[in-house]
Amino acid sequence: MSEAIWVKLVGTLPSLLWVVFATVVYLSLRGTIVQSLVPRISALRALGVEVEMAGQLIDQAAEVSETAVTPADRQGVLGRLEHAADILSGGKILWVDDHPENNVALIRLFRSVDMRVDTVLSTSEARLALGHGSYDIILSDIERHGDPQAGISMLRELERMVIALPVLVHAANFNPELGIDRRIFAATNKPVEIVHYVIDLMERARFGSPQV
């Protein structure tokens, strides 16, 4: 073999060694790299929808409720949804509202993370649902069928039934200056805040903390 060929081989040896070294390192660390990506991949798959679709549902819910969603609000709630996907999966919500069409976007959003959402139109229907199934959270409006205190009356009914589930109020005409009933975990007219509160309550339920 000529001297020129030997010189050329010697010159390419460092590059070949780096390729071999990189290959060995990749094969050695491949399992660790994949495992580090699993939580994020699982969270994205558990969402059931693309993150952008979840963002669109948030925007639709805000539009129906006539509340503004800032870019920071949007980014924050989508980030929580992604990381709380496993906690939300399997959660059960009973939603009491005589206008469920106003909640379609949020219902779709919660169902997209594998939550069960049952909708009823009245307190009497809520009693039947609670008697035949178990739930983690009750979501309710305040005014129903012309009764401005229907939601509050339902709370007293829950007490008589000895049902201690946390109650979230989502009402377009909610006025925090009027105060919040002791049985209400939180109340708001902002869909983004409802999502945060649902995550908060499901975290408590999963980790065994007191709910109310």
Task: Mark where each language-model region is.
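Membrane-aqueous junction of the first/signal-anchor transmembrane helix
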Residues: M1-E63
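Charged docking surfaces used in two-component/phosphorelay signaling
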Residues: V104-S112
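Acidic, metal-coordinating helix/loop segments flanking the phosphotransfer/catalytic sites
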Residues: T119-I137, H145
